[in-house]
Amino acid sequence: MTDRPATGIESLVLDAAPLLVQARIAGLADKYYIPASVVAELRDARARDYLHTLHTTGQIDLEVREPGAEALKMVMEFAKQTGDYAVLSKPDLHVLALTYALEVEAHGTWRIRQTVGGKTGQQLHEERRLEEKRVAQPQSQGAKDAIQQGGRAEAQN
């Protein structure tokens, strides 16, 4: 691995499309991942050479990695809920599942929806925090009013 500046994006999972068109992907992320099924999908010699050159010249830190059975299961179930499962290829599912797996490794399921249209753990936490703040606010305002009223009553005596 070469010394590259941090990009702000830790991990980027590659699909075949940017490699087929030889998009400028170097410098977009700190680390790049690609499922073996996507590498196998690269039948175009230019796309394979492009990926090889990016990696061997140190332009990208690349790891060929599989998503794991649990991540693949979660993505497949979610894709069935959205109705997308029938149109996703095996490499598509592997890209999504690897993205899911990397997110879970880095941050847990905190930022991931479990159901279509559902809220993330982060959103649920924020809603609870705001509700607690809203409930506590009238009580604290009532205490302030009582203190102010008490001060006026004493001043009048």
List PLM regions with ranges.
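Active-site-proximal, substrate-binding regions of enzyme catalytic domains
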Residues: 2-157
